[in-house]
Regions:
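Internal helical hairpin/lid segments
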Residues: 283-302, 370-424
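C-terminal accessory subdomain/extension
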Residues: 307-316, 320, 338, 342, ...
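A non-catalytic, amphipathic alpha-helix used as a structural packing/dimerization or gating element
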Residues: 43-51, 177, 214, 218-221, ...
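Short polybasic linear motifs
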Residues: 326, 331-334
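Active-site loop/helix belt of alpha/beta enzymes
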Residues: 162-319, 330, 338, 342, ...
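A charged N-terminal "starter" segment
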Residues: 1-120, 311-314, 338, 343-344, ...
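Active-site-proximal beta-alpha core segment in soluble small-molecule metabolic enzymes
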Residues: 62-209, 311
């Protein structure tokens, strides 16, 4: 159940709340707790943290995972302890949470304008690298910092974008003009170049990868066009130039195209760090990222210019691997259904949906809990939603007490995984969800379509996977913690405690 930090909750261990379970942590059987309930598997979480850290070490790049996925300082700390260089965030409020939590370095993938906010970003204690994408932005930020009498310059990254993309300078020339404006500002210091390839396409076939690679080469053009002397003030303060890109879908391509520039020792030029910002990997999911992660595309750390395991000739359509799931609810790429080149890239991440199965390169291994490929790397889904059947008004329909107030629906509906009967001796109900799928969500209800002959009853528990963890986690102030997936346990989980989020 979701709770509001401004609304006190009843002190009962029948729900996960700050007043109840969170204040007196002790193991509680999940079947004794109120639904809906979001759980996070700590074993899977630690697996994902360690896996991504190991992959980055092998690839020879740094990682500043996007903290907006979880907004949970406890999880950020796990990532930092595993070797993350910093944490990426999207808003000044999120940066304030990170500063309070002691995060040493933050990439602010956005821009602030209020003088007091900018002064706080520039304050000692946490190194904040804020994005700027236009000369006008630089002018406004510079003037605001002057009014605020900030005690030190604010480090900024020039954001490079793309026509029809999201934010970011639309050409190399525009980006270079932004860099010149930063260099001329007494209140800013140029720290590097940033971009986000995931705003351009969601396709993982050869055409989609070509769009991503061309964009990433543009980032290199911006970095080279700026030239080493422009970074001297930043370098002289003991920092390294930052070249950053990479969400959770194309981080392999970032390494392939940009990886050779990672040179924190300065052996080939100015000290430079290539920093990935992938965030969703830490939670992973049962649908969207399960299909699109590079680890499902038979790709591992790749040297610059490598193919990353993409087969341009053969593709196969894949689903979720579980009966009746929402795996075929895909996002489209470009609005016309085709990629026509760099300038024809889609307007945004998941801008529209297609009913066709998504095409991924042959050689993938999307089945299994982590979509594990032959690289030996895999992510595991950490999140599960538990809901009760509250109505069986028709033979082929069950209503669950979970809705869009509790879970995401922007990139697919929850995925039915398993059913349990809390009051029965043999609680597991094999087969009752065969062929089932969630067809829609209201605020507090999910429409579960199933075989009219299914034995699912009112009062049964349904275990659901999620698609797109970011927009599920943000609905929960407390997430119940368990260990070991239900698939491996064979018994209902025991809730050990909870993780607090700071949305």
């Amino acid at each position: 159940m979701t709770t509001s930090p401004s609304t006190p909750s009843a002190p009962a261990v029948t729900s996960i709340t700050k007043v109840g379970f969170g204040r007196e942590p002790r193991p509680v059987p999940l079947i004794d707790l109120a639904t809906p309930l979001l759980t996070i598997d700590l074993d899977a979480l630690d697996h994902n943290v360690v896996t991504m850290a190991a992959w980055c070490r092998e690839a020879g790049v740094d990682l500043a995972p996007h903290g907006k996925t979880t907004m949970a300082p406890e999880i950020w700390r796990r990532q930092l302890d595993a070797g993350a260089w910093g944490i990426t965030l999207a808003t000044a409020f999120q940066v304030a949470v990170a500063r309070e939590a002691g995060v040493p370095t933050v990439v602010l993938a956005g821009t602030a304008f209020a003088p007091a906010t900018l002064a706080a970003l520039a304050a000692p204690g946490t190194d904040v690298l804020m994005w700027v994408d236009s000369v006008e932005t630089v002018r406004l930020v510079d003037a605001a910092l002057a009014r605020a009498e900030a005690e030190r310059p604010l480090a900024v990254l020039v954001e490079f974008g793309s026509p029809l993309g999201r934010t970011g300078a639309r050409s190399v020339r525009e980006a270079l003009l932004v860099a010149e404006a930063v260099a001329a500002s007494p209140h800013l210091v140029l720290a590097g170049v940033a971009g986000y390839e995931g705003a351009l396409t969601h396709d993982v076939d050869a055409a989609g990868v070509a769009v991503v690679d061309e964009y990433l080469r543009g980032l290199l053009d911006v970095l080279d066009g700026i030239g080493a002397p422009a970074f001297d003030p930043w370098l002289s303060s003991g920092h390294d130039v930052v070249l950053t890109a990479g969400g959770s879908v194309y981080f392999d391509r970032v390494v392939a195209v940009l990886g050779d520039r990672h040179d924190p020792s300065g052996l080939q030029g100015p000290r430079t760090r290539v920093v990935l910002r992938s965030g969703s990997y830490v939670a992973h999911d049962h649908d969207l990222y399960r299909r699109l992660t590079p680890f499902a595309r038979d790709t591992g750390p790749t040297t610059a210019g490598g193919a990353g395991g993409v087969d341009a000739d053969v593709t196969v359509a894949v689903g979720d691997g579980s009966a009746g799931s929402q795996a075929d609810r895909e996002m489209g790429g470009p609005t016309d259904g085709e990629l026509t080149g760099f300038d024809g890239a889609a307007e945004g991440f998941g801008a529209e949906r297609s009913e066709e199965p998504h095409a991924v390169p042959a050689g993938s291994s999307p089945t299994g809990p982590g979509a594990e490929a032959s690289t030996g790397f895999s992510f595991l889904p950490t999140l599960e939603l538990w809901a009760s059947v509250v109505s069986r008004p028709e033979p082929g329909l069950a209503l669950l007490n979970v809705g869009r107030r509790d879970t995401s629906d922007d990139e697919g509906f929850p995925v039915p995984l398993e059913a349990w009967r809390p009051q029965a001796a043999d609680r597991r109900l094999p087969g009752v969800l065969d062929g089932s799928h969630v067809s829609g969500l209201n605020d507090q209800h999910a429409f579960l379509r199933l075989d009219p002959a299914s034995g699912l009853q009112v009062g049964d528990l349904v275990r659901l996977g999620v698609s797109h963890p970011c927009t599920t986690i943000d609905k929960w102030n407390e997430i119940a913690t368990v260990r070991g997936s239900a698939d491996r346990r064979g018994v209902p989980p025991v809730v050990e405690g909870s993780i607090t989020t700071r949305f």
